[in-house]
Amino acid sequence: MNIKAIAKEVLEFLIYLIIMVAAVIALRHFVVESFRVDGHSMDYTLQHDERLFMWKLAKIERFDVVVIKAPSDPSKRYIKRVIGVPGDTIEVRDDKLYLNGVATDEPYLAEKVKEYQAANPNGNFTQNFTLAQVAGASTVPEGKYFVLGDNRQNSLDGRSFGFIDANTVEGEADVSYWPLNRLEIGRAHV
């Protein structure tokens, strides 16, 4: 091989490398990003230090687990479950979620609620509330969501900070990849 042929191969390799790096950066910035769970507000579904992929282009729906900018400090991020979408009325009464007046199952909490009720027959895993009591409005406004942590007794969520703006949702967290024993697609969506 002559020097020209080697230089051509090196240049081709560098071009491919630059394209690959640019593609990875674009994917991370616009499509998917890794996220580490920091804290216990989603215990029972997600664990502290668990690693997830966050899909930035996902259409957010009720019960999705999402990464949001913290209302009090946008440089921080929280992970919560979307409970209310625009137009919803929400109430929790005697550990039952009522969406638009209809009792709605929360399978992601069922086991923990049973355990809690067995140990605390006169207590509620989730304290009773209405949307009006905690957020100051009876329905979720357009362009907003109402979010809760799955660890209802230890979560800074919509009961404290009210509605979140839809534009503060960074993406849906739906694929757990670390630790490997928790590797699963869609588990957070249960």
Model-derived regions: residue spans:
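Soluble "head" domains of membrane/secretory-pathway proteins
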Residues: N2-V10, F30, H48-R187
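Hydrophobic, membrane-facing alpha-helical anchors
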Residues: V10-L11, R36
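Hydrophobic membrane-insertion alpha-helices, especially the h-region
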Residues: E12-F30
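Membrane-proximal juxtamembrane linkers immediately C-terminal to transmembrane helices
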Residues: D43-Q47
